[in-house]
């Protein structure tokens, strides 16, 4: 889990150093947020299935 956090942090740092048009950055941010939400939902579903 810590490695994943480290990887995402370094990826975010790398992405922020690259100059990007504002619109592209906004789209990327939205994609990233959606991806995180989907991951959280999948984790919740897995936990619920394990508990049942």
Curated annotation (Swiss-Prot):
GO terms for molecular function: ATPase binding; ATPase inhibitor activity; enzyme inhibitor activity; identical protein binding; protein homodimerization activity; transmembrane transporter binding; transporter inhibitor activity. InterPro entries: PLB. It comes from the Eukaryota. The chain crosses the membrane at residues 32-52. A lipid is attached at residue 36 (S-palmitoyl cysteine). Heart muscle (at protein level). It is a single-pass membrane protein. The modification N-acetylmethionine is found at residue 1. The modification Phosphoserine is found at residue 16. Keywords: Acetylation, Cardiomyopathy, Disease variant, Endoplasmic reticulum, Lipoprotein, Membrane, Mitochondrion, Palmitate, Phosphoprotein, Sarcoplasmic reticulum, Transmembrane, Transmembrane helix. Pfam families: Phospholamban (PF04272). GO terms for cellular component: calcium ion-transporting ATPase complex; endoplasmic reticulum; endoplasmic reticulum membrane; membrane; mitochondrial membrane; mitochondrion; perinuclear region of cytoplasm; phospholamban complex. Changing residue 9 to H: In CMD1P; impairs phosphorylation by PKA and inhibition of ATP2A1-mediated calcium uptake. GO terms for biological process: acrosome assembly; adenylate cyclase-activating adrenergic receptor signaling pathway involved in heart process; blood circulation; calcium ion transport; cardiac muscle tissue development; circadian sleep/wake cycle, sleep; intracellular calcium ion homeostasis; locomotor rhythm. Residues 1-31 are cytoplasmic. It is found in: Endoplasmic reticulum membrane; Sarcoplasmic reticulum membrane; Mitochondrion membrane; Membrane. Phosphorylation by PKA abolishes the inhibition of ATP2A2-mediated calcium uptake. Phosphorylated at Thr-17 by CaMK2, and in response to beta-adrenergic stimulation. Phosphorylation by DMPK may stimulate sarcoplasmic reticulum calcium uptake in cardiomyocytes. Palmitoylated by ZDHHC16, promoting formation of the homopentamer. Belongs to the phospholamban family. For practical reasons, PLN activity is most often studied with ATP2A1 instead of ATP2A2. Reversibly inhibits the activity of ATP2A2/SERCA2 in cardiac sarcoplasmic reticulum by decreasing the apparent affinity of the ATPase for Ca(2+). Binds preferentially to the ATP-bound E1 conformational form of ATP2A2 which predominates at low Ca(2+) concentrations during the diastolic phase of the cardiac cycle. Inhibits ATP2A2 Ca(2+) affinity by disrupting its allosteric activation by ATP. Modulates the contractility of the heart muscle in response to physiological stimuli via its effects on ATP2A2. It is linked to Cardiomyopathy, dilated, 1P: A disorder characterized by ventricular dilation and impaired systolic function, resulting in congestive heart failure and arrhythmia. Patients are at risk of premature death. Homopentamer. Can also form heterooligomers with other sarcoplasmic/endoplasmic reticulum calcium ATPase (SERCA) regulators ARLN, ERLN, SLN and STRIT1/DWORF. Monomer. Interacts with HAX1. Interacts as a monomer with ATP2A2; the interaction decreases ATP2A2 Ca(2+) affinity. Interacts with VMP1; VMP1 competes with PLN and SLN to prevent them from forming an inhibitory complex with ATP2A2. Interacts with S100A1 in a Ca(2+)-dependent manner. This is Phospholamban. The gene is PLN.
């Amino acid at each position: 889990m810590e490695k994943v956090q480290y990887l995402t942090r370094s990826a975010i740092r790398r992405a922020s150093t690259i100059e990007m048009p504002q619109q592209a950055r906004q789209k990327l941010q939205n994609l990233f947020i959606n991806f995180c939400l989907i991951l959280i939902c999948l984790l919740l579903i897995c936990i619920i299935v394990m508990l049942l």
